[in-house]
Amino acid sequence: DTGSRGLGDVYKRQEPMLITFQECCNHFSEKIGNWPVVISGSWFNILPKGGRTERHRHESSVISGAFYLDLPEGDFGKFFVVSPLQPYMMCVHNVRETPYGMYFYDVPIKEKHLYLFPSWLEHGSRTNNTEHDRWTVSFNTSAFSQEMLDPRFVESVWGKGHESS
């Protein structure tokens, strides 16, 4: 990975953007039949020229999200997902390429759009080949409210001395 990350304490901040993200997570959870979730951590990514994010998953999270604040013109390092069916695809003979037969799928992202996905889904970002930075705000969710979490877990995620709201 090449890029900058900043951590923020979502429990101490109540920006309209985070409230909107939580509302979107509530709607998404309802649509897919999940229990409600709460945003448990957030950060921002600045992907400079030549930067990329390797394939990864978000362990100990239910739903993850990425909001694209600023997309430069051109080949800005698209968001991709890895098919969870990859290990089971034997002898695929597609007539044409579709998301159903692909190992990797480049998600057609747009500026100022929020993308939610199950945290177990492997994903990453292609290389930013533009002269400008690509900015995103990302977050994870938990099936528990912060007050229900073990204080040791809270400290490991948000740091020593974190106070519940």
Name these PLM-found stretches.
Residues 13-51, 56-60:
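N-terminal onset of structured domains
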Residues 40-42, 63-65, 135-139:
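Hydrophobic residues positioned within well-ordered beta-strands of beta-sheet architectures
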Residues 126-136:
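Ligand-binding loop in jelly-roll beta-barrel domains
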Residues 45-116, 126, 143-155:
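Catalytic core of non-heme Fe(II) oxygenases with the double-stranded beta-helix
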